Every structure is written in structure tokens, then in C-alpha cells.
Amino acid sequence: MKLSKAHTLVLLSLGYLFTVPFYVVWLWVEGIPKIGPNFWWAVFFHVPLWSIAMILTIEAHRRSPFILTAPYLALTPAFLLVSSPLMGGGYPTRLGVLGVLFVTFGVYFLNVKEGQNGILDPFIQIGKEKGSLFMLFVALIGAVVTNLDFIALKNANGPFYVLIDGMLMALVSVILILIYWQRGKIETSEFSIKSFWPFFLFGFFLFGAVFFHMTALKFIQNVPYEIAGKRTGVILATVGSGLILASLKRFQGKFKEEKEQLGYRLFGVGLIVAGMLIIILRG
């Protein structure tokens, strides 16, 4: 996203469109599936819910500091412990529940910045920061739409589902762009596109994330476990990337803070590793 000055919705709409060729190739490899009875209603609910989550995420990052909004995404695996059994997304074992909670708290601690007014500061800010409240809703929506992904997967296959869903999300993004533009929330300059290269990269990495997400769901067959595993990626995002970038002279200390806070974040990393070991060995 840092490679383009285009509005987030513009980036998302073009990003979804650039995923289409990858999805078509993936569908060609796996073949067109037999569509089950629950496929279309899963898509029907997924698109508007994920669109709402997208809007809330954009507004949250506009209204509140990232440090107060990021921790809420860690709550999705915990919410899935309730939503997944109700929606057919899998029943974790008791130790599996413990592992998911370990991962949840670990991801949360990774995103809590040293020097805040306590580790519960993001929750305390709910009444003060609308962005915090928005991201809490995003985490709740995530606990629903991930189960819808699993339902759609069981009633078709991964590439067919994400191709249909991705094209509909691109259409919704375009509609949202027009609405935002008419209300003056998008400047004309934010439509400026000097190069399609950033959008191609965004589409490629979006495809990669979706591909591994759907493939993991196909084999794990347990939504809380899969999302808990997915959230462990923040170890690389918040710790690994910070250390690597902080060590490169090219960035001239721009990521020095991430390196300095490594010790503070090791506790979160330890919880995540412990949680995943519990899930793998006893889940």
C-alpha cells in the first residue's frame, strides 16, 4: 500500500481485479466443482459483511492510532471458539481451546506498545476512540466470514469460490468509491494512477494470502485452529520484518523502534509458539 498514493478503496478494487487472472489459472488446475446447496448463501452473506468490515477498517485507521486498533484483530480466534461450533466450522478440544487462547493473547501482546497506560489500554480507549470500537466490530465480523469461507469451500472448491467472491468484492469496492467520492471523502488526486505495478503486487500478494488460507482450511477442517495459525504470521510482520528492516542501512534507522522493543514483544512470541504447539500436538 505504501507504493501508491491512491485511496485505499481504489487500491482494493484494482487489487481484487488483478487477482482474477490468478484465480482463473487456479480454477483451471482444480476444475469447475459441483456446487452444493449452501454455496450461494455463503457468498450472499460474505460479500456485504466483508464490505462492512473493509469500510470499518478504513475508518478506524483514519480516526485512531494504529497502536490502538491493531490488537483487536487478535480477538478473532477467540470469537471463533463460539461462532465456529454454531456455524459448523469445527469443535476444538479443550486443550485446543487453550492453544487458541494462548495465540490470541500472544498476538495481542505483540501489538501492545511499551509505554502505553497498561496492557488493557486499547480496551479502555473504546469509549474514547471510535476507531477502537470499529476494529472490535471487524474482529467480530471476521469470526463470521471465516466460517462462511469454510462453508463455501465445502460446497464448491477454493478457486471457484474466491473467483466469484473476488469479482463481487471488486464491484462493491467500485460502488463504495463512487459513494465516497460523491460525499467528498475521496479527493480527485486519490484517483491518480501513475503505475499499475503497485496494484499488480497488491493483487499478487492478496492472491497468495487467499490461496494459503483456503488451502489450509481444506486440510485442517477446523476454522479456529486455521485462523490461530494464520495469526502467527504477525511474528514475522511485527518482529521479523522490523529486525530485518532496522538492520538495513538503506532505511537509516527508520525501523529502530521495532528493534528496540523486541524484548518487550518476546513474551507475546512465546505465547504464540506455546499455543501453536498445543494445537499441533494436542488439538
Predicted regions and their residues:
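Helix-capping/transition residues at the boundaries of transmembrane alpha-helices
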Residues: L3-K5, H61, G88, L153-K154, ...
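Loop-to-transmembrane alpha-helix entry segments
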Residues: P37, L73, L86-G118, A246-I278
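Cytoplasmic-side transmembrane-helix entry/capping segments in multi-pass membrane proteins
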Residues: K5-L17, S64-T76, G96-V100, Q125-L136, ...
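Specific alpha-helical transmembrane segments that line the substrate/conduction pathway
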Residues: H46-W50, H61-V107, V162-L171, Q221-L243
